[in-house]
UniProtKB/Swiss-Prot annotation:
Keywords: Cell membrane, Ion transport, Manganese, Membrane, Transmembrane, Transmembrane helix, Transport. GO terms for molecular function: manganese ion transmembrane transporter activity. The keyword RNA-binding does not apply. It comes from Bacillus cereus (strain G9842). Its main location: membrane. Belongs to the MntP (TC 9.B.29) family. The chain crosses the membrane at residues 6-26, 37-57, 71-91, 101-121, 131-151, 162-182. This is Putative manganese efflux pump MntP.
Length: 182
């Protein structure tokens, strides 16, 4: 692979990773330990490897209409997760909040990475080099997720008890933006 071929993939990796950054910014406003931030970033990175890989494999066999379904499903997952965070924050009123562990971490990572499935479909149709592409997507998304989580963690301290609600609203807003781009 030449440098000229690598540049578009790097740009695409950052574009996909910005989704992870934006959503992680909101998620970082939850009470997270550094170990949880590490796991969340790694999980997002792994999903950004798995989802485009599946998309690239299926992209050679499926029509382009499934890209719209993946896009829609990712948006709905983010909106649902955002509403859940706002709801649980208001309901629990100062108690320990739900943090993204177990199945909720996988739902979160899946929702953030589902757009990379659509990109994988397109790249599979065009025959992009699979290994380099998916590793680049995973690494950049993991790095940007960590940055977003850490910035969100510090922003939470400035926002006080409303930080988690703001984080949930960011997730809902991002999901709505995916559904209805301006």
């Amino acid at each position: 692979m030449t440098f000229e071929q690598l540049i578009p993939l790097i740009i695409m990796a950052f574009a996909l990773g910005m989704d992870a950054f934006s959503v992680s910014l909101g998620m970082g406003m939850m009470p997270l330990k550094l170990r949880q931030i590490l796991y969340i970033g790694m999980t997002i990175g792994i999903f950004h490897i798995i989802m485009p890989f599946i998309g690239m494999v299926l992209g050679r066999f499926l029509s382009e209409k499934y890209g719209d379904i993946a896009h829609f499903a990712g948006a709905i997952l983010l909106i649902g997760l955002g509403f859940y965070i706002v709801y649980s924050t208001i309901l629990q009123n100062g108690e320990t909040r739900t943090v993204p562990i177990g199945i909720s971490l996988f739902v979160f990572a899946f929702g953030v990475s589902i757009d990379s499935f659509s990109v994988g479909l397109s790249l599979g149709i065009y025959g992009a080099q699979t290994i380099i592409t998916i590793l680049l997507f995973g690494f950049v998304s993991m790095l940007l997720a960590w940055i977003g989580l850490l910035i969100g963690r510090h922003a939470k301290d400035m926002l006080g008890t409303y930080g988690e609600i703001v984080g949930g609203i960011i997730l809902v807003g991002f999901g709505l933006y995916i559904l209805f781009p301006i």
